[in-house]
Amino acid sequence: MASKIHNGILILTLILFASCRTQKPAPRPAPPETVDFPTANIPLPVMDFNFMLPETPELAVCHSPRKDITEAFTPRDKSQIAIKDPKLFDENNTEIIDLSLIPSGEYAFPLPKGNVISPYGGRRRHHSGVDIKTCANDTIVSAFDGIVRMAKPFAAYGNVIVVRHYNGLETIYSHNSKNLVKPGDRVLAGQPIALTGRTGRATTEHLHFETRINGVHFNPNIVFNMAKRKLRSKCLVCTQKGNNVIVKSVDILPHQKAGPYVPPP
């Protein structure tokens, strides 16, 4: 009896084992291509986060460099070319004029279509300016904003005009056939001030143009690119030594503009 029960259990075990080996697992369902999440109308907090942002900076307006200049002229100021301005070099022996700060609308080439026929300097005699030529009675304009200090006939200059500018420079325009302004007139850059001529010591109609600071002339080509008739983007370092003024044209870095310029030894 026991052997029959044992045989029956063995047979049943073999049948179950055989069925487990032949049965295949049920296939898994494929995942859905999209998942639909449950929708919920959850209100978001309404907040203004602009307080976390920096304020929008205002665009800086570029103005010409202005200096404290003498605007009231004595009779001597109105009759001499080389005149010092007592307000220049009053605190130290260096004045800086950054030409790159002058906007395009606040400067003008003195003879808009002119060409240089005689440069500054020279071997035979020292030429105190440049000679620029176009045609007779062409319009001469002021190089910068300023005040007319002198307008009259003067020796070899003939009819001459001297304009004192707010940037510290003075410009001279001579051999004019006619002066269109008088001392004390305020002029703007590009404003007509005279007509070209050959008055004084001149052999042909042209403009004799000078740049000066504190009465001392220096090369106008430092200020203007004469070939392109454009203002140079340079910084003029003007150093007074006795009665003379040495003018150097240098490139200046932005961080140097924040403090006083210390000239090299």
Model-derived regions: residue spans:
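Polar/charged, compositionally biased leader and regulatory segments
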Residues: 2, 20-119, 230-265
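Bacterial N-terminal signal peptides
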Residues: 9-17
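Catalytic cores of peptidoglycan-degrading enzymes
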Residues: 103-237, 243
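Intrinsically disordered, low-complexity regions enriched for glutamine and histidine
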Residues: 4, 21, 204-206
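Bacterial N-terminal signal peptides that target proteins for export
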Residues: 1-9
